């Protein structure tokens, strides 16, 4: 997980939160690629078709790793888990939960060139960026 891009991390997390069992092959396709291969959505969709019969043990280990990564990220970057898009409120606010891909767009200021840079960032660097941006907006 240390080499994940922000895009891979956010895409896998959004799919996991939406319906981790239905999206298991796609989540595996996003996170498990040949070394050095960049993430491409079309390739991931094709790979997901081939992973449909993947053993449940692999899925469970993959999910345990993703959950462990989130626990570490939450310890290091807690502000990322209180959404800046909902003013950092927790609980039932009547608003739809912020998606990780929305945070990625927010971190890139919703500008195409900046968003592409953010997508290619390492996931840990992305979390540090989001955490610092939340801090900056909180002190304005």
Role assignments for model-derived ranges:
Residues 1-140:
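An amphipathic, hydrophobic-aromatic interaction surface with interspersed Lys/Arg
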